[in-house]
Amino acid sequence: MKLLLIILSFLLLYSPVIGNSHKGETLYGWGNTLPYVWKGVGDKETHPKYEGDVENGVPNGLGVLISTNGWKYFGSWKNGEIWNGTEYDKDGNIIYRWVEGKRKYSNLYKSY
């Protein structure tokens, strides 16, 4: 019984460290450019804020990144990097589409 309690305590305390995935987490990007170093702490005034799926401590799956100057990225992430989605400026104009981790289609037009 004592061993079972020790094992359960270990799993509960260290499960975020040993690489499981979570939906709806918040991370903050540290660094000046993509790809960021992702941390669970930050200030939305100085660090880009990510909300979405997280695996192994980095964005992986669907999520939203909001930069400190107002642009936003909505879409999928792969191993902490932007993968397939759309980047908008602070006014809601589409500025880039991302396809398999590369910026594409820099047509500027208003989204509705």
What is the role of each PLM region?
Residues 4-13:
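Sec-dependent N-terminal signal peptides
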